[in-house]
C-alpha cells in the first residue's frame, strides 16, 4: 500500500509538471517572438570570434554567449525590433528572421531547466504534499513572467537563469549521491554538473563569484566531514571548480569588461567627492585631468575601489541598505509590452505572489537560514545537513552576486542585481518546502 501511494504521488507530480509545461507553452505567444536591446549588437559581435580562439574568452562578452551567437550564425543578421527603456521606446515582440531560432532555443531550454530543477527537489523530499508543492511552486516560479519573459529577449539573462536552474538541479543530485563512489550514473552526473557550471559561469562575470563561494563551501565540507573526504569524485569536481574560477577571474580582468562600469563608478561616486578623491590619492591616483590617470585607472582602479569600500564600512553598508527597496522593486522585464489576455492577467497575479517586490525577502532568507542552522544541531540527519549546506551556498552566492552587481557599476542597479534578487526569492520557496518536509521526517541518519 505504501509503495502504491508513493507511486501515485509521483505520477500525480508528473501530471502537475505536464500541466505546467502546457501552460508555459501556450500562454506566451509564439516561441519565436523576440526583441533586442542596447546590448544585443555586442553579443552578435562576440559571436564573430573564431571558435575556441582567445577572443572567445577575452572580448566584451563571455564565452557562453559568444559561443551561443557563434553557433546561431547571427553575424550579418539585421535587428528589426529593438527596445530602449531609458528612451521610453518599449515595443511589442516580433518574429525576426535569424533571431527566431535563438529565442526558440532559449524558451525550450528554460522549460527543460525549470522542469529539471523541480524534479530534482521533488525527488529528495519524502512527504507527498511537499512533493506536489515543490513541483508546482518551482515550475511556476520559472514559468511566470519574472523569468519567462526574458526568454524572448536577445541578451544573456535567459541563459543565466536556465543554466543556473540546470546547474542547481545537478548539484542537488551530486550532493545526495556523493557516497555512491562506483556508480556510473553518478560519474555522468558529476560531468554534467561541471559542464553546466562552466557554461553558466561564463554567461556573466558575476557568476564566477558564485563558483568561488561553491569552492569555499566544498573545501570546508571536505575537511569537516570524513565521508566527503572518502569520495574521490567530489575532490575531482572541487578541483575543477577551482580551476574554472581562476580562469573566469583572469578572463574578466584581461578582457577589460570591467572598465566601462568602473568608469561609471568613479565618475558618479568617487570623483565628485573631495574626501573620496583624497583617499584615492593616498593609493596613488593622479589628477583625473592628467595623462597618467588613464594608465593608473587601467592598472589599479578595481583594486583601489575595493580598498575604498573595505576602508569605509559605514558607507558601504548604508549605501547598500538604502537601495534595498529599489533593488527588490521589480519583478518584470522592461523591454516589451504584452497583450493583456486572461492568461497573461492570471500569470501576472501569480508572478506577484511568487516574486514579491519587497526587500523583506532578503530578511526572511536570513531568518530561514538561521532557523535551518539551529535545527541542524537538534536534528542531525544526512539529508537535512545536505539541504542546509545548499542553503548556505546559495545564500552566500546570492549575497556575493548582489554585492558585485551593486558596487561594480553605478548605472542599471536593478538589472545588475536582478539575478541575485531572483536567487533570494527562489531560496525562500525551496527551503520553506524543505523545512516543512524535514519536520515530518522520521529518519535520523547520522553523518559519519
What annotation goes with each model-predicted range?
Residues 28-45, 56-85, 297-298:
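Extracytoplasmic catalytic/substrate-binding loops of multi-pass membrane glycan-assembly enzymes
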Residues 100-128, 166, 170:
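Transmembrane-helix motifs of polytopic, lipid-linked glycan transferases
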Residues 97-110, 323-399:
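Membrane-interface anchor segments at the N-terminal boundary of transmembrane helices
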Residues 250-341:
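Membrane-proximal stem/loop segments at transmembrane-domain junctions that anchor or position
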Residues 159-179, 193-197, 214-215, 427:
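Specific aromatic-rich, kink-prone transmembrane helix
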Residues 7-35, 143, 241-253:
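Transmembrane signal-anchor helices characteristic of membrane glycosylation enzymes that use polyprenol
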Residues 188-204, 240-245:
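Membrane-interface alpha helices of multi-pass inner-membrane proteins
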Residues 102-105, 139-171, 203-210, 417-419:
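Multi-pass, polyprenyl lipid-linked donor-dependent membrane glycosyltransferases
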Amino acid at each position: 500500500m505504501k509503495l502504491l501511494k508513493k507511486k501515485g504521488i509521483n505520477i500525480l507530480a508528473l501530471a502537475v509538471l505536464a500541466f505546467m509545461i502546457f501552460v508555459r507553452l501556450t500562454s506566451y505567444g509564439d516561441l519565436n517572438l523576440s526583441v533586442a536591446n542596447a546590448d544585443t549588437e555586442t553579443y552578435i559581435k562576440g559571436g564573430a570570434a573564431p571558435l575556441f580562439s582567445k577572443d572567445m574568452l577575452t572580448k566584451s562578452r563571455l564565452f557562453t554567449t559568444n559561443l551561443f551567437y557563434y553557433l546561431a550564425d547571427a553575424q550579418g543578421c539585421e535587428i528589426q525590433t529593438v527596445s530602449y527603456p531609458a528612451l521610453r521606446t518599449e515595443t511589442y515582440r516580433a518574429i525576426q528572421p535569424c533571431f527566431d531560432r535563438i529565442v526558440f532555443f532559449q524558451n525550450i531550454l528554460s522549460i527543460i531547466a525549470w522542469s529539471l530543477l523541480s524534479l530534482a527537489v521533488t525527488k529528495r523530499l519524502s512527504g507527498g504534499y511537499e512533493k506536489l508543492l515543490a513541483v508546482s511552486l518551482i515550475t511556476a516560479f520559472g514559468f511566470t513572467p519574472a523569468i519567462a519573459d526574458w526568454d524572448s529577449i536577445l541578451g544573456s539573462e535567459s541563459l543565466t537563469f536556465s543554466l543556473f536552474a540546470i546547474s542547481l538541479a545537478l548539484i542537488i543530485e551530486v550532493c545526495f549521491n556523493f557516497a555512491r563512489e562506483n556508480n556510473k550514473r553518478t560519474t555522468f552526473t558529476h560531468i554534467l554538473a561541471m559542464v553546466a557550471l562552466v557554461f553558466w559561469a561564463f554567461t556573466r562575470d558575476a557568476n564566477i563569484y558564485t563558483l568561488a563561494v561553491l569552492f569555499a563551501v566544498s573545501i570546508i565540507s571536505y575537511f569537516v566531514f570524513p565521508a566527503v573526504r572518502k569520495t574521490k569524485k567530489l575532490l575531482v569536481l572541487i578541483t575543477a571548480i577551482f580551476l574554472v574560477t581562476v580562469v573566469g577571474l583572469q578572463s574578466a580582468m584581461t578582457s577589460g569588461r570591467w572598465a566601462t562600469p568602473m568608469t561609471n563608478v568613479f565618475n558618479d561616486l568617487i570623483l565628485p567627492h573631495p574626501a573620496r578623491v583624497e583617499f584615492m590619492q593616498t593609493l596613488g591616483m593622479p589628477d583625473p585631468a592628467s595623462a597618467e590617470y588613464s594608465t593608473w585607472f587601467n592598472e589599479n582602479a578595481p583594486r583601489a575601489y575595493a580598498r575604498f569600500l573595505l576602508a569605509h564600512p559605514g558607507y558601504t553598508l548604508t549605501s547598500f541598505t538604502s537601495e534595498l527597496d529599489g533593488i527588490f522593486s521589480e519583478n518584470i522585464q522592461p523591454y516589451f509590452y504584452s497583450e493583456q489576455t486572461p492568461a497573461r492577467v492570471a500569470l501576472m497575479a501569480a508572478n506577484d505572489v511568487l516574486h514579491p517586490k519587497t526587500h523583506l525577502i532578503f530578511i526572511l532568507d536570513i531568518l530561514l537560514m538561521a532557523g535551518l542552522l539551529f535545527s541542524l544541531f537538534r536534528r542531525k540527519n544526512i539529508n537535512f545537513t545536505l539541504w542546509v549546506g545548499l542553503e548556505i551556498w546559495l545564500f552566500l552566492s546570492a549575497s556575493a552576486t548582489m554585492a558585485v552587481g551593486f558596487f561594480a557599476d553605478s548605472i542599471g542597479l536593478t538589472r545588475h542585481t536582478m539575478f541575485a534578487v531572483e536567487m533570494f526569492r527562489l531560496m525562500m520557496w525551496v527551503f520553506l518546502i524543505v523545512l516543512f518536509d524535514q519536520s515530518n521526517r522520521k529518519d535520523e541518519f547520522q553523518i559519519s
